[in-house]
């Protein structure tokens, strides 16, 4: 915050305190509708757009496994964050290049509930004036659900029908091997099933793996 802004705020404070309670109560409540979740900026000669897919919540207990719960809660409290729940935002990035649009990760994908807290990437693409049919490359960083979930539509079709899908070879080899699934912890097995769903024959035909 700039010094000038702080000074103006300090000078205005006495005047704000003189506002009658009736006037304060008459103010309209803040709207509940979410503003379009995208932000556009430049990377050298390219235009990039971050696309908000929503956010999820997770309990703090058990989420961080390499530190005691008390230490995690202390750090959260020092950062003025809740100590019982973590809010995790999901954002994908799209870059406009002379060859077309390149999308990095695809969000959680379509959700059944209309008020679901995630799965908003397509709506925010539309709000930003970006057409999924113009995406020529989709780069997947890894195979967690919030990265590959948006590869297909609610009907099971390819969400980006003209795109080549680029994935790390190591990720592809691990999550498509049934032997790995059988010896993985229970908590990881959903990712194997989700990988099979997202990389159905239609999207698998668009696949290009890269060496790690």
Model-predicted segments: where are they?
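Catalytic metal-binding/acid-base residues of hydrolase active sites
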Residues: 107-109, 144, 171
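Short, solvent-exposed loop/turn and secondary-structure capping segments
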Residues: 61, 114-115, 150-152, 177-178
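C-terminal segment of N-terminal export signals and the immediately downstream linker at the start
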Residues: 19-49
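Conserved beta-strand hairpin/beta-sheet module of binuclear metal-dependent hydrolase folds
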Residues: 37-128
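Active-site metal-binding motif and surrounding structural segment of the metallo-beta-lactamase
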Residues: 92, 116-166
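Hydrophobic/aromatic beta-strand patches that form the interior of the parallel beta-sheet core
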Residues: 49-51, 139, 166, 208
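Metallo-beta-lactamase
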Residues: 126-130, 134, 161-164, 169-212
């Amino acid at each position: 915050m700039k010094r000038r802004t702080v000074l103006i705020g300090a000078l205005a404070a006495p005047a704000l305190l003189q506002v009658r309670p009736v006037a304060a109560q008459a103010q309209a409540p803040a709207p509940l509708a979410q503003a379009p979740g995208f932000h556009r900026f430049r990377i050298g000669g390219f235009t990039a757009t971050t696309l908000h897919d929503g956010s999820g919540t997770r309990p703090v207990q058990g989420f961080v496994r390499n530190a005691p719960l008390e230490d995690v809660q202390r750090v959260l409290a020092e950062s003025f964050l809740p100590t019982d729940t973590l809010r995790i935002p999901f954002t994908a990035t799209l870059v406009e290049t002379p060859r077309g649009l390149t999308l990095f990760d695809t969000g959680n994908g379509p959700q059944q509930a209309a008020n679901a807290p995630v799965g908003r990437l397509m709506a925010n693409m539309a709000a930003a004036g970006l057409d999924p049919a113009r995406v020529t490359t989709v780069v997947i960083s890894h195979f967690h659900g919030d990265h590959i979930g948006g590869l297909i539509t609610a009907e099971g079709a390819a969400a980006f029908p003209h795109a080549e899908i680029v994935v790390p070879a190591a990720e592809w080899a691990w999550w498509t091997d049934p032997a790995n699934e059988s010896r993985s912890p229970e908590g990881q097995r959903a990712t194997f099933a989700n990988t099979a769903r997202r990389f159905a024959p239609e999207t698998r035909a668009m696949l290009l793996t890269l060496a790690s």
